Amino acid sequence: MAVTDSLSRAATVLATVLLLSFGSVAASHIEDQAEQFFRSGHTNNWAVLVCTSRFWFNYRHVANTLSVYRSVKRLGIPDSHIVLMLADDMACNPRNPKPATVFSHKNMELNVYGDDVEVDYRSYEVTVENFLRVLTGRIPPSTPRSKRLLSDDRSNILIYMTGHGGNGFLKFQDSEEITNIELADAFEQMWQKRRYNELLFIIDTCQGASMYERFYSPNIMALASSQVGEDSLSHQPDPAIGVHLMDRYTFYVLEFLEEINPASQTNMNDLFQVCPKSLCVSTPGHRTDLFQRDPKNVLITDFFGSVRKVEITTETIKLQQDSEIMESSYKEDQMDEKLMEPLKYAEQLPVAQIIHQKPKLKDWHPPGGFILGLWALIIMVFFKTYGIKHMKFIF
């Protein structure tokens, strides 16, 4: 008996220790998540996605932008928080072998245009002026809400740009340019006007690193597809379409983002490594000296995903409803079920039967008095004009 009692006590003590340790681990995990949430310091995410190139041979730049658009939507950023600027409509281009589609993978495996793409600025609207107005908020009052960047000092903003560029500039539709100085000043205006909390700038263009050299505003992290003096190369030529489908840097970034889910703990340091020189041929670059947080503590979803607000409470919430509320909800459910019944259409003949169906014979009715009188008048006029002697020449 003594041995049994001692064993039971030991088992009880061991179970208590295990429960306490498990509870402490779970509590520490919850505390870490809460600390991460409050440390991020933002309450909403925005994305400004810009393709600055037009013409069919720049198909890949439109596909780049639409691929990023698809990823941020998949991770939870709604269209109301995305400003999409496309300088050309490749989906409706006469050279497109499959209209209303834009593919980002060879053999036409992935259509990134889809059925729910909301383009906010297109064609001639994609200009340097409109881009800077979107960033700084200097927009005419008549501008619709979908074309505005309605961010605040608690907003994390992703700005993605792709096109043709050089040392210190990015071309817009081969007609104008935005310089790295103009871009840096626009970001400073955004900071002074409290239009962002943190900003992630990504650019895929030749000599892309030159575009973030002049940045001087706080809380900006920047990534580029190539260093100064290097070209950003294309990827995946498609013989059916006749052009390259994407650029190398964006292609590998999108492959990386496809593995991310809204609850992922992947950080920005992982994003820095997605496209080494062996894959991109060019040398991707990044700048973090203006950013206050350590990149390893910055989640990918802090910019590419939606903000999921979590509130920890100790209050007890009653889930049981009163009888009257239960009865009314039951009646509403019954009404909803009746309304949700599928509609039944009248039975119709198949198209083939309709085409080959014989026409219905009409019933014969004797002619009316008006018809008989008309024929009598015609005969009288004939005999008066020609007479009986001309009948032999007629018949």
UniProtKB/Swiss-Prot annotation:
Outcome (variant: D302A): No effect on function in GPI-anchor attachment to protein
Lumenal topological segments: 28-368
PTM annotation: The disulfide bond between PIGK/GPI8 and PIGT is important for normal enzyme activity.
Consequence of changing D247K: Almost abolishes the GPI-anchor transamidase activity
InterPro entries in the cross-refs: GPI_transamidase, Peptidase_C13
Enzyme class: transferase
Effect of R54A: No effect on function in GPI-anchor attachment to protein
Documented effect of changing C92S: Decreased function in GPI-anchor attachment to protein
Active-site residues (renumbered): H164, C206
GO MF, one example: GPI-anchor transamidase activity
Mutation effect (Y160A): No effect on function in GPI-anchor attachment to protein
Binding site for a protein: C206, S232, S234
E.C. number: 2.6.1.-
Phenotype upon changing R60E: Reduces by 90% the GPI-anchor transamidase activity
UniProt effect for mutating H164A: Loss of function in GPI-anchor attachment to protein. Abolishes GPI-anchor transamidase activity
Documented effect of changing D204A: Decreased function in GPI-anchor attachment to protein
Alphabetically ordered keywords of this record: Disease variant, Disulfide bond, Endoplasmic reticulum, Epilepsy, GPI-anchor biosynthesis, Intellectual disability, Membrane, Signal, Transferase, Transmembrane, Transmembrane helix
Main localization category: endoplasmic reticulum
Recorded topology in the membrane: Single-pass type I membrane protein
Disease cited in the entry: Neurodevelopmental disorder with hypotonia and cerebellar atrophy, with or without seizures: An autosomal recessive neurodevelopmental disorder characterized by global developmental delay, intellectual disability, hypotonia, cerebellar ataxia, cerebellar atrophy, delayed motor skills, poor or absent speech, and epilepsy in most patients. Some patients manifest facial dysmorphism. Disease onset is in infancy.
PANTHER family: GPI-ANCHOR TRANSAMIDASE
Subunit (UniProt): Heteropentamer. Part of the GPI-anchor transamidase complex, consisting of PIGK, PIGT, PIGS, PIGU and GAA1. Interacts with GPAA1. Interacts with PIGT; this interaction, via a disulfide link, stabilizes the expression of GAA1 and PIGK and links them to PIGS.
Protein's name in the database: GPI-anchor transamidase
Gene coding for it: PIGK
